[in-house]
Amino acid sequence: LRKLFDARGSAIHGASCVHVRHSDNPTPGEPMTNDWLFLGSPQCAALFASLHDVSRYRIATMGAGTSQSLPSGTPIAWTGSGNPERVFGELSQVVGDSAVWIPHANRTMRRWEGHLLHAKPWHFYNVEAKVVQLPSHDVALVSSPSNAEGYKASGGTAPVVAIGETTAKKVREIGLTLAGTAA
């Protein structure tokens, strides 16, 4: 993304409009050595690795950005394309009937349902919109519905490029101007 903006003579200024915190919910059961662990976002991966020993799992991630959020040297058994609509169908072919632990946020869309035979979801963390000091900008790139809410709460009014249809829907719902949608 940065290369695209640089090529057009534009600058990117980043500011996350969400806060992630542990939910304090216990693990619903006892993970077995070599169970799969699916990490669905960079924030989830970083938080999970800070609180748990990830070496006991075979790790699957939503995409490359999530994999990169884990500590250096963490073995990743499978990395998805980053497209939530496809990832769980693809992952189901890899894990078969193995247990897959899914630490998820309070606002998850539960896209694994209907794909994974032995999904072990648990509400591991909360995502909350937060107010930030926005830099001067012409367009906002918003990566999630929660980020859209945080952007608006921060006084954002610029046209928005939303990552994914769910985010685009939230952008329209809260009255921001949708300039486009990226996959």
Report each predicted region and the residues it spans.
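Signature of uroporphyrinogen-III synthase
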Residues: 1-183
